[in-house]
């Protein structure tokens, strides 16, 4: 069983983390069963967020009475100290616990620091002094903020998108975290569903002994796939290298990662799915993307207000309105049978 230590936190867990964002989409009974199955199989790191609707409550139900056996990380998107304390209180209540193992600032547009006027980092320190949190972390999608967080020495963990589509700058973050004795938690290890070979994804992550990937699962079949890697971890070989190289070529350039930070859209467009529809049609069974329900969602692109709010919020600097239009045009051609994706 491969283990990973999250830097100076000293937290050592199985090198398969459980990303609890997707369980907000399933029933509480199914979510509890999934989380408990993960634990029974050896997973002990569970990552959630106040922003993930009822995800925290489901983990709270799953691990009620066995808190010391799991490591729970959650997040706050608070912009000020008052909201920080509100979020922390709700999270503790939902998770049925009196402490959070790793409390993370959730994708802030800046790196919270003492004296920056927000009171956020000071609140973190006070929460830690009170024993309500044990370690301070930050999550982000922006290289500049991530680098600043590492360089500041203020954080014990960084959660950042990291998969086999990573750039050299992403790889440098992993190296810097190791040098700083800072835990690195890899989100989007499957690039929001664009990577469809979990064995290749796992083999890539396994090359970095300081990286803890968190796999977002909502189906038992998905979970069992990752559980199988606990005792039989995939290793990098020529076949996997060739697959990764192929995907890097196909997915190079500007594409939507599906992070959802552009949401909600004032026109009701499901941007985080619609803006990457062309890729989803070609990298997964296309029938699921051509249902009447999905057609209705894509048609909403016609209602785009061109307010550019999504563009301004995108942590990857994408021209989201243009990307939506390109995906919609391609989608219409596929629907009309003018373009084959099979």
Predicted features along the sequence, with ranges:
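N-terminal binding-site loop/beta-alpha segment at the start of enzyme catalytic domains
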Residues: 1-70
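A general structural detector for well-ordered alpha-helical segments in enzyme core domains, enriched
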Residues: 2, 34-35, 58-62, 87-91, ...
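Conserved, mostly hydrophobic/aromatic
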Residues: 6, 18, 46, 59, ...
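Conserved residues at the C-terminal ends of beta-strands
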Residues: 19, 49, 103-106, 139, ...
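Glycine/proline-rich, positively charged
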Residues: 29, 36, 40, 79-185, ...
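Structured C-terminal cap/extension of enzyme domains
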Residues: 43-44, 172-186, 190-342
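Short catalytic-loop micro-motif centered on adjacent basic/acidic residues
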Residues: 44-50, 73-74, 134-137, 157-160, ...
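Short hydrophobic/aromatic-enriched beta-strand-loop microsegments
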Residues: 69-72, 155-163, 234-240
């Amino acid at each position: 069983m491969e283990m990973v230590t999250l830097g100076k936190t000293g937290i050592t867990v199985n090198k398969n983390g459980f990303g609890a964002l997707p369980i907000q989409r399933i029933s509480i009974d199914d979510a509890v069963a999934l989380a408990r199955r993960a634990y029974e199989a050896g997973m002990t790191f569970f990552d959630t967020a106040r922003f993930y609707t009822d995800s925290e409550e489901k983990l709270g139900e799953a691990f009620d009475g066995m808190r010391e056996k799991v490591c729970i990380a959650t997040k706050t998107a608070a912009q000020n100290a008052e909201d920080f304390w509100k979020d922390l209180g709700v999270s503790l209540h939902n998770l049925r616990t009196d402490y959070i193992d790793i409390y993370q600032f959730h994708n802030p547009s800046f790196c919270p620091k003492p004296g920056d006027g927000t009171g956020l980092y000071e609140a973190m320190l006070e929460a830690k002094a009170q024993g309500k949190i044990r370690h301070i972390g930050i999550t982000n999608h922006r290289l500049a903020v991530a680098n600043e967080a590492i360089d500041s020495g203020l954080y014990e963990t960084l959660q950042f998108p990291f998969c086999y589509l990573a750039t050299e700058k992403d790889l440098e973050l992993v190296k810097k975290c190791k040098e700083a004795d800072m835990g690195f938690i890899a989100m989007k290890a499957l690039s929001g569903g664009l990577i469809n070979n979990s064995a290749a994804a796992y083999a890539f992550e396994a090359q970095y002994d300081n990286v803890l990937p968190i796999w977002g699962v909502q189906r038992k079949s998905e979970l069992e796939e990752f559980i199988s890697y606990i005792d039989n971890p995939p290793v990098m070989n020529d076949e996997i290298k060739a697959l990764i190289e192929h995907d890097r070529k196909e997915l190079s350039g500007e594409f939507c990662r599906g992070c959802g930070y552009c949401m909600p859209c004032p026109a009701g467009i499901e941007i985080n799915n619609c803006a990457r529809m062309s890729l989803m049609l070609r990298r997964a069974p296309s029938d699921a993307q051509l249902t009447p329900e999905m057609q209705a969602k894509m048609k909403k692109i016609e209602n785009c207000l061109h307010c550019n709010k999504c563009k301004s919020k995108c942590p990857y600097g994408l021209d989201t309105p243009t990307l939506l239009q390109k995906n919609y045009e391609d989608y219409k051609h596929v629907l009309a049978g003018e373009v084959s994706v099979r």
